[in-house]
Curated annotation (Swiss-Prot):
Heterodimers. Binds weakly to CYSTM7 and WIH1/CYSTM13. The chain crosses the membrane at residues 33-53. One of its GO terms (cellular component) is extracellular region. Belongs to the CYSTM1 family. The keyword Glycoprotein does not apply. This is Protein CYSTEINE-RICH TRANSMEMBRANE MODULE 2. GO terms for biological process: cellular detoxification; detoxification of cadmium ion; detoxification of copper ion. It comes from Arabidopsis thaliana. One of its GO terms (molecular function) is metal ion sequestering activity.
Amino acid sequence: MTMSRNGKTNKAAYSQRFTRCSVAVAATRSASVVAAAFDFYICIIISTLLSLIVSLASQLLF
């Protein structure tokens, strides 16, 4: 009886640990996706600003 009960307890503890780990991994993945999207957005803004500056400079020089 105690062996069966202990086995159930261990299984429940493992299940809880696995669930917590899965939530942590999912949160990390979503955070990294958000960070990658933010980096991409910043890169687009910077490249747009640089092309605008080059365009304005070329109009002023020529």
